[in-house]
């Protein structure tokens, strides 16, 4: 895959001036990475090779991280694992949301510190290593504590939660660092490349999961999956170590004041951004995929009578869908921005909800997981792209942290609502119907948000 060519952009006196900003065409091939072409002839503060290296390392870091998590796929593996360990419907329902929700909790409270940083990489690397260690600890506990059945469910559930909480301390600085490293128009391609790398690893993860759970079912198998996940997370951290931090053209230093004053000012800061308020509503009503997928693996295996190990097939086909969805997201996001990706993902979610209600065959559910991967990653690329472009640069760290904090409650409320309906009615079909309605409402709200690139093109 050949990504768009990009050159640096400088800013002076609040105006964006284009220093030979040039983007080559986006060509998607089956290879996830290829060299970024370089046509720069003007001198830059940072050599184009540094920008290219950062872009590739950024893609590898995300690909290895999410590829490692694929061995404990939150949408596929974790719900069934929790059920096998005796978890209730309420816990099963939140498993796809627990990691992203935990990630977003701490960001709002550390963003004042992040805004004062002049260099983000030391902060990102420190908390990045700490957030990966819980998977190693969990794997070792599951392997050696064979007689501690009472501890198994808490270990499995708390591992992504603790990892997310620690990661959330660093994610605001990470997002700001990446936003400064990757030019606006190629951000969608960068996010897509990360997801494609993840999906390539995830396809292999599906086969590994099937073999591990076939030959070592239960606790030993779960231990092996946690240790494999940690190995990939460590590769992710090493990839990030090779990135060279770029200084910002503008650096915002917030006025000195008490921490309480900072917290009191947050509601007013968000209220002054009506498009971000709509985006919060879009995110909440766009949780249809996660509401359904919490119980989809259970429904599919119970309906077809297949063993737990066969969920590896679901993981493989979900990641094939992720690759194709990410390729489309890279091309469409490059040309049209993030809004169209979000609309398309919600249309696909409606189709997905209808399909999982009418199919009863293993091949039909396998196809449903392909559609899940395709639509879910259109949504993720679109959300990351649109969010970065809607937030004003001078308060981007704080605003993104606020959006993340609001998203915690969106994730937990939507998935808990699905879990409540499932536990009260026992009907998977009712949960899927609610998710489809949510997606339709989300499309209506999205129509009221103008695409930022269209506005900048007119101005």
Would you name each region that the model predicts?
Residues 340-380:
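C-terminal transmembrane helical hairpin of 12-TM major facilitator-type secondary transporters
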Residues 57-75, 95-111, 127-131, 159-243, ...:
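Substrate-agnostic recognition of the 12-TM MFS/MFS-like secondary transporter fold
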Residues 25-105, 131, 275-315:
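Helix-loop boundary and gating motifs at the non-cytosolic
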Residues 122-138, 340-355:
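Structural signature of the two symmetry-related core transmembrane helices
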Residues 244-264, 455-459:
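Flexible cytoplasmic inter-helical loops of multi-pass small-molecule transporters
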Residues 32, 141-143, 232-244, 433-459:
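Multi-pass alpha-helical transporter architecture, strongest
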Residues 140-158, 357-368:
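Helix-loop junctions at membrane interfaces in 12-TM secondary transporters
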Residues 137-138, 163, 240, 355-356, ...:
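MFS-fold secondary transporters
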């Amino acid at each position: 895959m050949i990504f768009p060519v990009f050159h640096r952009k400088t800013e002076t006196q609040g105006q964006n001036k284009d220093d030979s900003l040039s983007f080559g065409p986006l060509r998607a091939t089956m290879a996830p990475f290829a060299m970024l072409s370089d046509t720069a002839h003007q001198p830059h503060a940072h050599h184009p090779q540094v920008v290219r290296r950062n872009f590739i390392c950024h893609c590898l870091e995300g690909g290895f991280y999410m590829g490692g998590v694929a061995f404990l796929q939150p949408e596929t593996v974790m719900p069934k694992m929790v059920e096998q360990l005796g978890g209730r419907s309420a816990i099963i329902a939140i498993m796809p949301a627990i990691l992203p929700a935990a990630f977003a909790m701490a960001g709002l409270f550390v963003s004042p510190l992040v805004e004062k940083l002049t260099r983000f990489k030391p902060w990102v690397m420190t908390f990045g290593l700490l957030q990966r260690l819980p998977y190693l600890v969990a794997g070792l506990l599951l392997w050696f504590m064979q007689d501690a059945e009472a501890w198994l469910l808490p270990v499995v559930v708390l591992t992504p939660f603790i990892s997310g909480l620690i990661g959330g301390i660093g994610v605001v600085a990470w997002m700001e660092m990446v936003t400064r490293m990757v030019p606006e128009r190629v951000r969608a391609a960068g996010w897509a490349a990360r997801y494609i790398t993840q999906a390539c690893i995830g396809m292999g993860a599906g086969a590994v999961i099937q073999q591990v759970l076939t030959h070592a079912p239960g606790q030993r198998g779960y231990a092996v999956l946690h240790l494999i996940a940690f190995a990939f997370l460590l590769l992710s951290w090493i990839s990030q170590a090779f990135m060279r931090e770029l200084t910002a053209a503008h650096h915002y230093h917030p006025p000195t004041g008490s921490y309480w004053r900072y917290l009191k000012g947050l509601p007013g800061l968000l209220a002054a951004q009506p498009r971000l308020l709509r985006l919060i509503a879009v995110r909440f009503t766009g949780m249809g995929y996660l509401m359904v997928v919490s119980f989809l693996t259970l429904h599919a295996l119970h309906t077809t009578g297949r063993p737990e190990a066969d969920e590896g097939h679901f993981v493989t086909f979900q990641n094939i869908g992720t690759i194709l969805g990410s390729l489309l997201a890279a091309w469409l996001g490059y040309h049209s921005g993030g809004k169209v990706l979000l609309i398309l993902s919600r249309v696909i979610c409606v189709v997905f909800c209808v399909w999982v209600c009418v199919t009863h065959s293993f091949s039909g559910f396998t196809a449903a997981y392909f559609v899940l991967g395709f639509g879910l990653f259109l949504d993720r690329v679109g959300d990351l792209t649109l969010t970065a472009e809607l937030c004003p640069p001078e308060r981007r760290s704080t605003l993104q942290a606020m959006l993340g904090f609001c998203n915690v409650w969106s994730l937990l409320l939507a998935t808990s609502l699905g879990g409540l309906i499932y536990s009260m009615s026992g009907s998977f079909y009712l949960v899927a119907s609610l998710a489809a309605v949510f997606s339709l409402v989300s499309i209506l709200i999205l129509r009221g948000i103008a695409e930022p690139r269209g506005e900048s093109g007119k101005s």
